[in-house]
Structures are given as structure tokens and as C-alpha cells.
Swiss-Prot record:
Domain of life, per lineage: Bacteria
Protein species of origin: Streptococcus pyogenes serotype M1
Gene, per the UniProt record: era
Residue ranges of coiled coil: none
Chain spans, region G4: 120-123
Membrane topology: Peripheral membrane protein
UniProt-recorded name of the protein: GTPase Era
Record-linked Gene3D superfamilies: 3.30.300.20, P-loop containing nucleotide triphosphate hydrolases (3.40.50.300)
Family annotation (PANTHER family): GTPASE ERA, GTPASE ERA, MITOCHONDRIAL
Era-type G domain mapped to chain residues: 3-170
Biological processes per GO annotation: ribosomal small subunit assembly
Chain sites annotated for binding GTP: 11-18, 58-62, 120-123
Subunit structure, as described in the record: Monomer.
GO annotations of cellular component type: cytosol; plasma membrane
Length: 298
């Protein structure tokens, strides 16, 4: 008998949702950084064994939106509740329950689907603090299970996977066993470039960045995949930061991104990057759609 199911990963920004998904999949399919709101689109991770398939949906961190992009991200996250049989509600062990968590809990109660509380980053706290956290969240909602984990170190992740597989129902294999995500390579390439911008720049730059892959094709002469990507920002000052002195920052972004892209594609890559200014793109629906943030996602 083959079993399958869809599982959403929900939570505030920066709680470790993408780190968890990448650990389960055994490779990077969702970008990570220490900046809040790194994930902007829903990302599907397809975990398949001989007897079961779990389709994880990693969602943007739920926050109080201040831009049209923020609205898109939050609606994209909540729309996932209509698509899944189980929710992993992830919270950090080293932070107390806050208003953002309570807001999500109210939506989860209304959705009336099983919710597993996943307390991440247990490597950062004393066990007594963890018990307090569990009691506090239990006072707000009746969770199906509570599983403490460290997504970064992999602690207790197998326990969580077993819990999910034990509760799967008989179903189809929705995706081939060698497919790990539903996103096209172009999307993953653009995300890897954006990840390096997040890692290497500070202050207001990360939230104002989008990456568009203009072209991606194999060069028959060099046998390399030639990629042309444009980094979009909102202000000239941000463009200057990303390019850097004599182009040094842009070269560093390109070099680091190329390494990850080559690992993903299993091919040599020639990556060409450009920087363009598109004023206030985060508040313009047409620009959001052009840059891959489309309402069709929810």
C-alpha cells in the first residue's frame, strides 16, 4: 500500500522553516539567510520513499505586511491551508510566544485541520525553558502533537518524519520519485542569486531586491549553461551597494551564486549579472507579477 499527503510548514519569519525543508530533502531547494522574510513564494519539497510520499509546502513567514509584496507573501502562506491535510506550525525555542504567533493560531483554529507544533532551535535553550514554551503554546491551542527539533543539527527530525508518515493515508504517488520540487530551474537560479545578495548586503537592501533570470541556455561551444540574471532594486543608492567599489560586490555575489547553481544543475555555468533600478516595485502589482510574485499562486 502506498501512502501520501500534503503538509504545510507555517510560522513567523526566520523560525527555520526553510532550514527544516532543506534538511529533510538532503539538498538546498529553499534559500536561507538571517534576514526576515527571506522566503517570498511557496516552495514545494517532495519527500519520496518506496512506500510513501510527503509533499511539503514551505511558506513565506507570516508578518504584518507593509507593502503589496508583503500582502502577497502573507496571502500565499495562508492559502496553503486549503491545500493540505496537516500543518507544521513552527516556532523558535529561544523566543517567547508573541502577537504574531497568536495571529497565526487564530487562523489555524479556523482552518480546522490537524496542527503539529514544531518547536525549532532546541539546541539554543535549556530543557526547562523548552517545557515552559510547550505549556505556553498548549494553553492557546489543542495541538495534535508537539515535536521539539533542531532543523540545523537534525535533532529529532527523523521522529517528526516518522510521525507524519505514520499518519499518512493511502493515496497516489503525485510526483515521480526523482522529483524534489515543483519549481522550474529558472526560479531556483533566481533564488540562489537573491540569497547571495541577502548574505552580502546590509540595512535596507535585502527587502528591496528581486532577481529575474532573463535567459538560460547551453552554449554548445563551451558546454556551459549561460545564464543572464538581472538584480532589481528600488533606489540608485541600493544599486551602488550591490555593484560595490569597481564592481567588487557584484563579482562576489556572482561567484558565490555560480557555485550553488553548478551544484544544483550538475553543469558548468557562466553567470552574467546586471543591476537595474525599478522604483517602488514592491508596491506595484504589475512589477510584482513580472518578477514572479503572482496572485495565481494563491
Amino acid at each position: 500500500m502506498f501512502k501520501s499527503g500534503f503538509v504545510a510548514i507555517l510560522g513567523r519569519p526566520n523560525v527555520g522553516k526553510s532550514t527544516f525543508l532543506n534538511h529533510v530533502m538532503g539538498q538546498k531547494i529553499a534559500i536561507m539567510s538571517d534576514k526576515a522574510q527571506t522566503t517570498r513564494n511557496k516552495i514545494m519539497g517532495i519527500y519520496t520513499t518506496e512506500t510513501e510520499q510527503i509533499v511539503f509546502i514551505d511558506t513565506p513567514g507570516i508578518h504584518k505586511p507593509k507593502t503589496a509584496l508583503g500582502d502577497f507573501m502573507v496571502e500565499s502562506a495562508y492559502s496553503t491551508l486549503r491545500e493540505v491535510e496537516t500543518v507544521l506550525f513552527m516556532v523558535p525555542a529561544d523566543e517567547k510566544r508573541g502577537k504574531g504567533d497568536d495571529m497565526i493560531i487564530e487562523r489555524l483554529k479556523a482552518a480546522k485541520i490537524p496542527v503539529i507544533l514544531v518547536i525549532n532551535k532546541i539546541d539554543k535553550v535549556h530543557p526547562d525553558q523548552l517545557l515552559e514554551q510547550i505549556d505556553d503554546f498548549h494553553s492557546q491551542m489543542d495541538f495534535k502533537e508537539v515535536v521539539p527539533i533542531s532543523a540545523l543539527e537534525g535533532n529529532n527530525v527523523p521522529t517528526l518524519i516518522k510521525l507524519l508518515t505514520d499518519n499518512l493515508e493511502e493515496g497516489f504517488q503525485y510526483f515521480p520519485e526523482d522529483q524534489i520540487t515543483d519549481h522550474p530551474e529558472r526560479f531556483l537560479v533566481s533564488e540562489m542569486v537573491r540569497e547571495k545578495v541577502l548574505h552580502l548586503t546590509q540595512q535596507e537592501v535585502p527587502h528591496s531586491v528581486a532577481v529575474v533570470v532573463e535567459s538560460m541556455k547551453r552554449d554548445e561551444e563551451t558546454d556551459k549553461v549561460h545564464i543572464r540574471a538581472t538584480i532589481m532594486v528600488e533606489r540608485d543608492s541600493q544599486k551602488g551597494i550591490i555593484i560595490g567599489k569597481q564592481g567588487a560586490m557584484l563579482k562576489k555575489i556572482g561567484k558565490m551564486a555560480r557555485r550553488d547553481i553548478e551544484l544544483m544543475l550538475g553543469d558548468k555555468v557562466y553567470l552574467e549579472t546586471w543591476v537595474k533600478v525599478k522604483k517602488n516595485w514592491r508596491d506595484k502589482k504589475l512589477d510584482l507579477a513580472d518578477f514572479g510574485y503572482n496572485e495565481k499562486e494563491y
